[in-house]
A protein has these predicted regions:
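Short N-terminal helix-initiation segments at or just after the protein's N-terminus
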Residues: 1-11, 62-73
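Small/polar-rich, solvent-exposed N-terminal microdomains that initiate assembly or binding
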Residues: 1-51, 87-97
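Short acidic, gly/pro-rich beta-turn/loop elements at beta-sheet edges
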Residues: 46-48, 71-73, 130
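Oligomerization/assembly interface segments of phage tail-like spikes and tubes
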Residues: 53-71, 116-128
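Low-complexity, flexible helical/coil segments
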Residues: 59, 71-79, 96-100
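Mid-chain, well-packed structural core segment of small domains
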Residues: 67-89
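Acidic-leaning, charged glycine-interspersed low-complexity segments
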Residues: 82-130
């Protein structure tokens, strides 16, 4: 399995997992609140030697929860965390543990001059062997 195939599989599984927990994943038009955006990085392959033909790939997964109010953002953040906590996505023939590595509490985001939104950011890490 190639790294790009794994990336596509992880991204699709992430969106499906969130949708199954009734979390609206942002589409091209951000016209309704609340929603979450997801960013899955290109995998990093460390130079470690595993002693066989396998390679370890590590993905960074970032989520940004967006709501019109702080309460809306907090409620959606709880659903996102519930969906991803202890989730073990399948890659290849095995499932792998997703780790929650960082979280920023909801905060008012004043970067958008035409609207008032609250955002919360979380970082997750997923390492797989292929």
């Amino acid at each position: 399995m190639k790294a790009g195939e794994v990336l596509a599989q992880v991204a699709a599984a992430l969106d499906a997992r969130l949708a199954a927990h009734k979390v609206r994943v942002a589409a091209a038009a951000f016209d309704a609140y609340p929603y979450v955006t997801t960013y899955v990085s290109s995998p990093v392959a460390p130079t470690e030697d595993l002693g066989d033909s396998r390679r370890r790939l590590t993905f960074s997964i970032n989520t940004v929860t967006v709501g019109e109010t702080e309460a809306q953002c907090v409620a959606l953040l709880a659903r996102v965390t519930d969906a991803l906590h202890r989730w073990r996505p399948e890659v290849g023939e095995r499932s792998w543990r997703l780790e929650h590595v960082a979280a920023m509490p909801p905060a008012y985001d004043d970067d958008l001059p035409d609207r008032r939104v609250w955002t919360a950011r979380d970082a997750w890490s997923l390492s797989v062997l292929i």
